[in-house]
Amino acid sequence: DWVGSLFSAYGAALDDAKGKITVDTPEVRQVLDYSKRLYAFLPPDVASWDNASNNKWLVSGKGALIFNPPSAWVVAKRDAPDVAEKLWTHAMPKGPKGRFAPLLPRYQGLWNFSKNKSAAKSLLVHINKPDNIRKLVAGAAGYDIPPYQKLLDYKVWDDQGPPPGTLSHYPNRGDQRNVMPCSPAPPPIASQLYTNAIMPKMMVRIGRGESIDKTLAWARSEIEGYSRQ
């Protein structure tokens, strides 16, 4: 997810909104050049990490920075309070084209064969009213973020600690904007790019010494395969 934000910060995309492959552009090359320099400072086994590895790395006291929701802080508060009180959530790094946070929206819907659609719709409308969203966000201790800016003025993020206010910049603040990873590619292609982790794999290939040209050729070949499906 954060690699998608990195691409957006440079104005880079692998596919445009019409499905045209845009792999070999100055912006994508900038991302790969930065990725190569960054990779030298990452843990040697980072490419084999699972979803919990970055949390464990940070809570162990060995790590200094991860890109993640505050689950690592929650674990540290429980298992390593001395680490938790030193953690702070802040905005994404800013690139030439701006500051972007990855957005992974979740949708609610009803089965078309449901036997009680009216009641189900009423429930969805009820739980999505601002006052109830506020209660749900508070119940999750601020972990789940509403997708709309007008719902980000809740005090829950400022009230969490230790340290006090550690989650205050977890929602978008200032000039940070949301971006869907792998956008603006058409959904059928974007879903393949995301599911197959094409952007992170490009970073790993560059970090392990592969040339930019070879990495771009590999990415193009992968995307061409998705475009034919």
Label the model's feature ranges.
Residues 1-21, 27, 63-65:
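Extracytoplasmic/periplasmic solute-binding protein
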Residues 2, 53-57, 73-80, 224:
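Pocket-flanking alpha-helical
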Residues 4, 29-39, 55, 59, ...:
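Non-transmembrane alpha-helical segments in soluble domains
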Residues 18-48, 92:
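Glycine-centered hinge/linker elements that transmit conformational signals in sensory
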Residues 45-60:
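Short helix-initiation/N-cap motifs at beta->coil->alpha
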Residues 49, 67-69:
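Short beta-strand and adjacent tight-turn residues that come in two discontinuous sequence segments
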Residues 71-84, 95-197:
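C-terminal lobe and pocket-closing loops
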Residues 175-229:
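Conserved C-terminal helix/tail region of periplasmic/extracytoplasmic solute-binding proteins
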